[in-house]
A protein has these predicted regions:
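N-terminal cap/lid segment of alpha/beta-hydrolase-fold proteins
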Residues: 2-39, 43, 400-406, 419-420, ...
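Accessory cap/linker subdomain of secreted extracellular hydrolases
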Residues: 53-57, 61-79, 83-90, 95, ...
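Glycine/threonine-rich phosphate-binding loop and adjacent beta-strand/alpha-helix elements that clamp
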Residues: 77, 314-316, 326-580
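Alpha/beta-hydrolase active-site loop
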Residues: 84-85, 95, 117-137
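Conserved alpha/beta-hydrolase
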Residues: 90, 94-110
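Alpha/beta-hydrolase fold nucleophile elbow
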Residues: 137-150
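Short glycine-enriched nucleophile-adjacent loop
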Residues: 152-163, 418
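Short beta-strand/loop motif that positions the catalytic acidic residue
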Residues: 264, 270-272
Length: 580
């Protein structure tokens, strides 16, 4: 099929499987939605591996149920027939004069080729798709890219390539550092790709064909018209989960999947989620800070990974942004604050506040020292030399502030400095920033994936403690991950550990706590047991660190010791925001 099938449905002109030829001859397929009749429309484009024909409701039942409960307005003013995972609804955008282009990425859905997610080839393809969309008869020549997660992450990469028709980027919950945020947290292998790739990507690889799902709209297979043997599919699918397991240190493989942010020039909106512990949160902040764009905005919200992308709040924000840059309309965006934060309180309360920068200029960086006597957390450093040990497969050590006498806002990046020794030649350190209510119970928050997440998480493999002095900040250490420095059993080493950006207003009577442990955080050992959930949710969702080859029990299932001396007092550096 060399041309698209065109039809008018639900007051939209739809071109199914429009061909987009790449420079190597591979033809990618896109579904195009635009207003009926002649005209030149601004374009909202996406490129990704989730199959443009797979309905959100069928492919992601648990997430759809959570979305429509949290944001019931999603069901209004739309038949929802064209809903696709992590992309905008055509029935809500085309009536506003936008054209939507959904491209199946190379090797996925209806596009043939080798499936190699986040590769340099994908960025080149996305560049070509932007240029194709910007030169069609129905296009006004201005192309914006929009989408959550995968559809956000690849925007950093193509933005750095500067396609001429690229006019705006909306990077909604999109990681920006392939090694540090997706594959290896603090050098520790994250198991996410092992569950994500077969479930969400390989299941719709081009050539799955009749073995896979069918479009609820067209009745056609969402993973291509041909059905290939599984052996053939394997030949055309990169070993995405296996590469990070084999590559313990940062190398060219990871570098090729991480953008040169200084090259990005297009206006961009980076939308982060306070609850994105384990994948995207850090990337939205770091990418925004590093991007070369003169016109860039940061927005931060809460709730699930998808709620506010589809809610009236998020849709309005996106349309104001794209209306300004793609249509040239006066949407009020010229008055949009460069930083817009939804400040988080317990019980899922958020209060919007406008700011000028990140981290906030008025931050009082405050050291909260870990105290071995009673395992307290406070402003006074301990003076006596001592040590506390913990079993790495146990609950670890928890240090708590006294109940607060007045509210305390923590908004920004967090870091800890510890002196740790191990019985072996290495140690994996898991940090959990927690909120404890007056009854002594953990206060958790709806996270992007898991409905019960803590205030913040941080990780570091002790052998990866080498810092880059040029990139490190007291509040955000930057580890090179290019060398392994083994420990000498029993000998303490200094560790600077990053806890990803967070926000919480701690009410009077509550406590802040820091837990140091040797394995993933769990709320109480139970599963949240969401209907149709694709994985257990015990506090960190799919972002587990349990690979026995990466975390050899002979090394990591042991005993660690936290050391205290007068001149080496471990502390937590908190971004305290003064009242008023």
């Amino acid at each position: 099929m060399d041309s698209a099938k065109n039809e008018i449905r639900d007051n939209m002109q739809i071109d199914w499987d429009a061909p987009i030829r790449m420079d190597d001859g591979v033809v990618l397929r896109a579904d195009v939605y635009h207003p009926v009749g002649k005209g030149k429309f601004p374009v909202i484009l996406s490129y990704g591996p989730y199959a443009k024909g797979l309905s959100f409701q069928e492919g992601y039942k648990s997430q759809w149920a959570r979305l429509t409960k949290a944001a019931p307005e999603v069901l209004q003013n739309s038949s929802n027939s064209y809903q696709n995972w992590e992309l905008v609804d055509p029935e809500k955008w085309v009536p506003d004069g936008f054209a939507l282009v959904r491209v199946d990425s190379r090797g996925a859905g209806c596009s043939p080729g080798t499936l190699d997610v986040w590769s340099a080839r994908e960025a080149q393809d996305l560049y070509a798709c932007v240029e194709w969309a910007g030169t069609q008869a129905w296009s006004n020549g201005k192309v914006g890219i929009n989408g959550i997660s995968y559809y956000a992450m690849n925007q950093w990469n193509v933005g750095a390539l500067k396609p001429p028709h690229l006019a705006a980027l909306c990077i909604w919950e999109g990681s920006s550092d392939y090694y540090r945020e997706l594959c290896r947290h603090g050098g520790i292998l994250c198991d996410f790709l092992n569950s994500w790739h077969p479930r969400q990507v390989a299941s719709v690889q081009h050539g799955v064909g009749s073995r896979g799902a069918k479009s609820l709209v067209t009745g056609e297979p969402v993973a291509g018209p041909e059905t290939l043997p599984k052996e053939e599919l394997a030949k055309h699918c990169a070993d995405t989960p296996g590469e990070p397991k084999r590559r313990r240190l940062h190398d060219d493989y990871y570098a090729a999947r991480t953008a040169d942010f200084a090259q990005i020039e297009a206006p961009l909106l980076s939308a982060a989620n306070w609850g994105g512990v384990g994948l995207h949160t850090r990337g939205n902040f770091e990418g925004w800070l590093a991007a070369g764009s003169q016109q860039k905005w940061l927005e931060v919200h809460g709730d699930t990974h998808f709620t506010h992308f589809y809610s009236n709040y998020g849709e309005t924000l996106q349309k104001r942004f794209f209306g300004h840059f793609l249509k040239g309309e006066d949407t009020g965006w010229s008055k949009q604050p460069r930083v817009s934060l939804n400040i988080r309180h317990p019980n899922e309360k958020f209060v919007r506040r406008d700011e000028n920068e990140w981290p906030l200029a008025r931050t009082k960086w405050t050291k909260y020292f870990l105290r071995p006597d009673g395992q307290g957390l406070g402003l006074d450093a301990p003076t006596a030399a001592t040590a506390l040990s913990y079993e790495t497969m146990g609950d670890g050590l928890t240090f708590r502030t006294p109940p607060l006498t007045k509210s305390l806002e923590i908004t920004g990046p967090v870091a800890a400095k510890l002196w740790v020794s191990s019985e072996t030649t290495d140690a994996d350190i898991f940090l959990v920033l927690r909120l404890i209510d007056p009854a002594g119970k953990d206060v958790t928050f709806i996270g992007s994936n898991d409905p019960r997440t803590p205030v913040g998480l941080g990780w570091l493999r002790a052998s990866h403690r080498k810092l880059d002095p040029a990139l490190s900040r007291p509040y955000r250490p930057w580890h090179t991950h290019d060398k392994e420095w083994p420990l000498k059993p029993g000998e303490p080493v200094e560790l600077d550990i990053e806890i990803w950006p967070t926000c919480i207003v701690v009410p009077p009577g509550y406590r802040l706590a820091l837990t140091i442990r040797g394995k993933d955080y769990e709320v109480d050992g139970t599963d949240a047991a969401l209907s149709n959930a694709p994985y257990p949710m015990k506090g960190v969702g799919p972002f587990l660190h349990i690979d026995p080859d990466d975390r050899d029990p002979k090394i990591f299932a042991s005993r660690n010791t936290l050391h205290f001396t007068a001149d080496k007092a471990p502390y937590l550096l908190l971004p305290v925001i003064p009242e008023g």
